[in-house]
C-alpha cells in the first residue's frame, strides 16, 4: 500500500516532506537526518520513501517512480543498500561496528547506501561512540536516517551532526481520513462514527489504530 503510506505521510507532515523535497531538488542532501515524534506518525515511512528518492533508477527525485527494481526492492525490504536496524532489539556495539565497517564500502546496487536506525536512543553508550565516529567523517556515498520517540536520550554529539525533523502528532480528522482510505483500499466496510471514535482515542498516532483493526472483527 505505498500510495496509502505516502498519503499518510503527506497528510500530517507536509513541513518535513517540503524540506526533504527541497534538499533532493537542490542536490544538497545532508549526510544524517533525525526524525523525532511519537509512534505512528510516519518516521520510518518517510525514511523509506527518502531511500527510494535517493536510489530510484530513474534518477534522484523527490518523487521516486515506485516501479523500478530499486523502488520495488526497497518496498519489499530486500534492497541490499538499505540497512535497517531496530536499536530496541540490537543495542550491542558489535551490531553498530559491523554497520560502520560496511559503511566504508561503496553501495552494491544503488547510488547511495542508506542506514535506517529506528529507536536510535536505545543504542548503548559504546554503540553511540562507534556511530559518532562515522557521523564525524561520513563517506560521501552514505546517508544515515535516524528515528526516535525519545530524542532527549540522545547524546548532544549525535544531535549536533543531524538535521532534525519533528513529526507532528496527527489531528483526529487526519487520522479518520487516512483510516477511511486504508479501509477502502482493503475493501473493508466501517461506520464513520466508529472511525471518528477510534481517531479521537488514537492520541495523534495512526499506527496504533492500524494495529487495533483486527480482521477477525470484520
Predicted segments — roles?
Residues 1-164:
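P-loop/Walker A NTP-binding region and its immediately flanking N-terminal helices
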Residues 6, 161, 178, 193-197, ...:
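A general alpha-helix detector
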Residues 40, 90, 149, 169-170, ...:
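Short, surface-exposed acidic/glycine-rich loop or hinge patches that mediate macromolecular interfaces
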Residues 86-88, 164-175, 188, 200:
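Conserved AAA+ ATPase "SRH/arginine-finger" region at the nucleotide-binding site
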Residues 99-103, 118, 161, 165, ...:
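Conserved AAA+ ATPase "sensor/coupling" helix adjacent to the nucleotide-binding pocket
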Residues 184, 193-207:
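A short helix-loop-helix "switch/interaction" segment in the helical subdomain of ASCE P-loop NTPases
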Residues 210-218:
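Conserved C-terminal helix/linker of AAA+ ATPases
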Amino acid at each position: 500500500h505505498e500510495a496509502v503510506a505516502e498519503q499518510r505521510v503527506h497528510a500530517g507532515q507536509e513541513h518535513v516532506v517540503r524540506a526533504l523535497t527541497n534538499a533532493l531538488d537542490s542536490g544538497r542532501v545532508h549526510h544524517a537526518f533525525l526524525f523525532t515524534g511519537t509512534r505512528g506518525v510516519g518516521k520510518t515511512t518517510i525514511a523509506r520513501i527518502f531511500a527510494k528518492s535517493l536510489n530510484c533508477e530513474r534518477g534522484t527525485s523527490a518523487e521516486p517512480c515506485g516501479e523500478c527494481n530499486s523502488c520495488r526492492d526497497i518496498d519489499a525490504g530486500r534492497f541490499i543498500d538499505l540497512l535497517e536496524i531496530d536499536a530496541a532489539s540490537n543495542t550491542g556495539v558489535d551490531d553498530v561496528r559491523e554497520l560502520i565497517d560496511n559503511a566504508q564500502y561503496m553501495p552494491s546496487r544503488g547510488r547511495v547506501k542508506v542506514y535506517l536506525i529506528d529507536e536510535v536512543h536505545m543504542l548503548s553508550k559504546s554503540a553511540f561512540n562507534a556511530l559518532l565516529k562515522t557521523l564525524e567523517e561520513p563517506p560521501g556515498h552514505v546517508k544515515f536516517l535516524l528515528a526516535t520517540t525519545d530524542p532527549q536520550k540522545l547524546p548532544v554529539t549525535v544531535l549536533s551532526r543531524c538535521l532534525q525533523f519533528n513529526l507532528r502528532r496527527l489531528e483526529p480528522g487526519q487520522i479518520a481520513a487516512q483510516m477511511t482510505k486504508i479501509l477502502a483500499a482493503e475493501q473493508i466496510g466501517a461506520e464513520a462514527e466508529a472511525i471518528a471514535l477510534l481517531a479521537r482515542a488514537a492520541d495523534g498516532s495512526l499506527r496504533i489504530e492500524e494495529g487495533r483493526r483486527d480482521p477477525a472483527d470484520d
